[in-house]
Amino acid sequence: MPNEAPIEVETRRHQMFPVLNAADIARIARFGTQRHYPADSCLFRAGEPGPGMYVVLKGVVAITQRDGLGNVTPIAEQGPGHFLAEVGQLSGHAALVDGHAMGEVETLLVPPDQLRALIIAEADLGERLVRALILRRVALIEAGASGPVLIGPPDSPDVRRLQNFLSRNGYPYHVVDATQDADAAALLEQYGEARLLVVCPNGAVLMNPTEDALARCLGMIDSEEHAELFDVVVVGAGPAGLATAVYAASEGLRVIVLDCRSYGGQAGASARIENYLGFPTGISGGALAGRAYVQAQKFGAEMLIPTKVVSMDCSKAHRSGELSITLEDGRQLRSRTVVIASGARYRRPAVPRLADFEGRGIWFWASALEAKLCAQQEVGLVGGGNSAGQAAVFLSQHAAKVNVLVRGPSLAASMSRYLIDRIEATPNIELHPHTELSGLHGDPETGLNGATWRDHRTGTEHDCAARNIFLFVGAEPETTWLDGCGVAVDRHGFVLTGQPASGGFPARPAAALESSVPGVFAVGDVRSGSVKRVGGAIGEGAAVVALIHQHLSGATTTA
């Protein structure tokens, strides 16, 4: 998944393309059905729903990549003992490459649900399969192979917007500058005034699409009606939500996960997390989230990402125990429990013209895409929490200088000691205590070209020619979708749980992570009083599953 360490394809080819022996294939056979394909027939096509995993029994299948501009690139030729799939086939997502029979081909087709069952039932074989599926996706991402083609100026805010969206969702893409490619230039001219075109693998051409429109074109989300009753709907796919999904699905509960943008939440944008248990050398937030995302799907959790939740109906919670979630497209999901894991977003400080420069020099995350923009430049970063510290250290490897602005006297009250030590030891990071961002300069069309910050004790102002400012300030809970459903929140909008939320329970107190509505739980940053750390969020996400079981058991016995 995204942000894994770079893959040397040749050195890891044996892991990416392992050859199954006769015993392996015999173990797989009970999960699939044999399929025959005549010469030159297509087994799967990029942009169309993938049928699952193929195991080649006889013949050879050519794997190629089509970029939507008429270019076809060979990737591999797979013969007997090879299996054809990447990680998207755990959920039957659209294929990223084409597969054609080079002569008569006999295969064993394992559909997505049976692929998940195989991985769990045959643990040692499943480990090899999952490793290969993940490595193949990462290799496609690193190569810029497959996926949509973004045609436009590489420094365009809209190009960067879609790059960030695709990267955060672990989806490969390729950017083409029309000034350097005749075919792209001709296509851009054909669409008149379009400043950005996206060519999807299925051939569809989108003009400066929204993230939702692009996701639908790529088949990242379905449009099916989900009439079944879920055991758990998880709203939010950050560390807390993904932990809930992994543990709930692994224990046999019917789980669906929703997020309006991508998996990983704020933590997914962290360049490196070094104090998470079990990773002594650290791990990027994207890699940690990506592994959890795959893990949840392995156990059968469904993912609807990106999908925006607009409201929740709790009117039946006390009677039938049924809750209803309404999505932005009008679809509804029914569930016996809901876990609110929608997190918090960074606050937008009251700085004049801030909105003019969002995506044009003002950033709320620091990924490799933004780091490239800062090469050998002076930048500003506002915030004193762990996310700010991780971003400062990461950006210092690219920028000439990183100015860290904090309102307080130091970082000690809000940042982990290991990050403070690292910042103090980094010569091109300068801490500005008692300081706040006060002004932004530039043209919205061309972007930010300078900023002003002020010492709030003395009123002294300083101008800096920073073209990029990173904001990691405060936290505003993502809870507007809860309006009107009876879930109690504190004065800042964070969800109350446990004893403070027990007013809605006439017969019993609310459980530790339960809200004021029976069967509605809250975990992670969105919960009032939670520890705003990745480890704490994951712990709450795991712990809530036991409370869900208790609630479902009680609902069953009283029905």
Regions inferred by a protein language model and the residue ranges of each:
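Cytosolic regulatory regions built on CNB/CRP/Popeye-like sensor folds
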Residues: M1-G152, S156-N164
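Beta1-alpha1 glycine-rich phosphate/pyrophosphate-binding loop at the start
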Residues: L150, P154-D181, L187, V234-A301, ...
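A short, hydrophobic beta-strand/beta-hairpin element that forms part of a small beta-sheet core
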Residues: L196-V205
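Short, well-ordered coil/turn residues at beta-beta hairpins
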Residues: P201, G236, S335, A341-S342, ...
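Glycine-rich dinucleotide-binding loop and its adjacent helix/turn
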Residues: E211-F230, S342-H398, L496, P509
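A Rossmann-like FAD-binding core segment of flavoenzymes
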Residues: A289-S335, I340-S342, S396-A507, Q550-A559
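FAD-site-proximal beta/loop scaffold in flavoenzymes
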Residues: A350, D356-L373, V473-V531
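A conserved FAD-binding loop/helix module that cradles the flavin
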Residues: G389-A391, P509-A511, V517, V523-A559
